[in-house]
Amino acid sequence: MTSLTVDVAIVGAGPGGSTLAALLARRGYSVALIDRDDFPRDKLCGEFLSYDAMPIAEALGIDLGGAPYIGHCRVVGRGRTYAFDFPHPARGVSRVFLDDALHRCAVAAGVQAVTAMATAVSRDGVTLENGIVRARVVAGAWGRWGRFDQQLERAFVRDRSHRNFGFKRHYRGEGTNGVIELYSFANGYLGVSDVEGGITNICGLVHARRLQGHKGKWDSFVEEIRAEEKPLEAMYARYEPAQDGFLSSEPVIFRSRSAVEEGIFMIGDASGVIDPLTGNGMAMALQSALVAAPFIAEALNDGDRKRSEDGYRNRHAELFNHRIAWSRRVAFLLSRPALLDAALRLRFRAAGPFFLRKTRADRDAIARMVAG
């Protein structure tokens, strides 16, 4: 039976949850980091860590030495391609590695890791299947979809017309050699990039309407899109699976979310989901933790909870809402192969830099936030 009383309880030990835990523990607060899984563990993800997350990873002392550098993006259409450079290198890093590294970082900072299934949350604590964690502040880092979203009656869970599903598998092959590739198919898209250990991650997103008749059979769905799109057939032919089967996601719904729900501070995907094509999801998870930490500290120190909640809600919207909106515009294009090809024929060279400005934070601004 677990019974704890702490300053902060965090539900979910992904990149956002572990980062927030480490930041708060370094400020001297007692923190419980709750996750049902043991580490290391795998998760569905594009496994692309954008350059605007690097100041946070570096400040936490995360060693990314084995993660390949990614300095370029290539958008592959039916008849044309478009390539552009990143202003700073990103890294290809698996969730197996990154989640474990951040979790270890949090524990090293003094965080109490709790491996248990959480069954209920409130602003005052977390009920576990085998106990309870009482806390002055609770943070939700359970990802893009969880039982607690339904418990809290968040509006997006009722949306059945905009549901997407992710799928991912690791492969071995020639690799992408410092490039992330983006491919289009009807009602979806996928990204291809290398991670550590000579592995290439192929991860996609598809609208639920495309999955009718497949019933979770991702092999048959991939065969279908390979038959539809020659670039996909050529790409998949270069690789052999490196793991058994696919990982897939719960519904991915791109609807607005509040960064605070019933007094619970939300971070990472629980606070807002950016389209995976941007490669900014993990960066946003780390950045939302960086933004939330001082407001949670303020709530703990000053006791003016409403001011802290409103401050975080406003700062979160300022930093992330425009990115999420722009990601949906680009996803509309990328999930329509004919429209993408028409756009590629325009040869708009500034499209890549424009896309990066609209879907990322300024790296130097994040570095200044880290420096405090």
Task: Explain the meaning of each model-derived region.
Residues 53-101:
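A conserved beta-strand/loop capping segment in the N-terminal third of enzymes
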Residues 294-372:
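C-terminal helical "tail/cap" subdomain of flavin- and related membrane-associated enzymes
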Residues 105-235:
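Predominantly flavin-linked oxidoreductase catalytic cores and closely associated redox partners
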Residues 212-292:
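FAD/FMN-dependent oxidoreductases across multiple families
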Residues 17-18:
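N-terminal Rossmann-fold NAD(P) dinucleotide-binding loop
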Residues 38-58:
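Conserved N-terminal glycine-rich FAD pyrophosphate-binding loop of Rossmann-like flavoproteins
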Residues 25-45:
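Glycine-rich FAD pyrophosphate-binding loop
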Residues 2-14:
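Beta1/beta-strand and adjacent pyrophosphate-binding region of the FAD-binding site
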